[in-house]
A protein has these predicted regions:
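Conserved glycine-rich cofactor-binding loop
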Residues: 8, 15-17
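Residue(s) in the substrate-gating loop at a strand-loop-helix junction
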Residues: 144
């Protein structure tokens, strides 16, 4: 139960759904966690009460805001003294519809949160890891199977998740070529049973999944334990698809 002992992880969108599942797995394995949310402040307070003030910190932040990133990283260092792991998990589904009907405002909001937020996270996490963690660490970008194939009625979401996939590749290669021991990988969930899945469509969704059921947040948490731990020291610039064989 100590695979992440003494590690400090920052998990955006970490107070509900997949993010909370990752946080629960990280706490179980001995990590200290900094959790963020833009709107769900009550969820953040509940998470800290559950995990303990000595092991967790909640920071309200907008991942698309550069100043919020600087503030959150500083609060992480002030509380725990270093940063070992960044999980870029926060995201939105965006507005559905064909590309010709999508407004620029709706497009930009999805890109700002899902892609620009990940860029800002990488930028400031790398700086902190270099300064406070001996230039060593792990960055995990939560993309989606929609980052591997296009969804016809979710063009902004698909673009943001595909962009996250290639941002992961570019950053991993850049750091490796610099001989900096900060690994960057992406995780691509399929359908995961969270509150955002419409109940009326559950049967239809499950019928498309070869294993016969949706995944759970813990399924993403477990792969993130591996990627955050020293066990994955040779995993870099890789894509981990967790979708019950849906895209096989």
């Amino acid at each position: 139960m100590d695979r992440l002992k003494d590690k400090v992880a920052l998990i955006t969108g970490g107070v509900a759904g997949i993010g909370l599942g990752i946080a629960e797995c990280y706490i179980r394995e001995g990590a200290k966690v900094v959790l963020t949310a833009n709107h769900n402040v009550d969820g953040g307070k509940r998470a800290v009460e559950k995990f303990g003030d000595d092991k967790s910190l909640f920071v309200q932040m907008n991942v698309a805001d550069e100043g919020d990133w600087q503030d959150t990283i500083q609060k992480t260092i002030d509380k725990f003294g270093k940063l070992d792991i960044l999980v870029n998990n926060a995201g939105v589904g965006g507005v559905n519809g064909p590309v010709e009907s999508l407004s620029l405002k709706d497009w930009q909001q999805t890109i700002d949160i899902n892609l620009t937020g990940n860029f800002l996270g990488e930028k400031y996490a790398i700086q902190a890891m270099k300064k406070y963690s001996n230039a060593k660490g792990s960055i995990i970008n939560i993309s989606s199977v929609a980052g591997l194939v296009g969804l016809p009625l979710s063009p902004a979401y698909s673009a943001s998740k595909g962009g996250t996939r290639l941002l992961t590749h570019a950053t991993a290669l850049s750091l490796a070529q610099q001989k900096v021991d900060i690994r960057v990988n992406s995780v691509h969930p399929g359908w995961i049973a969270t509150d955002i899945v419409p109940k009326e469509y559950e049967k239809q969704i499950v019928s498309t999944i070869p294993v016969g059921h949706m995944g759970e947040p813990v399924d993403i948490g477990e792969i993130c334990i591996y990627l955050g731990s020293d066990e994955s020291k040779f995993a870099n610039g890789a894509e981990f698809v967790i979708d019950g064989a849906q895209r096989a």
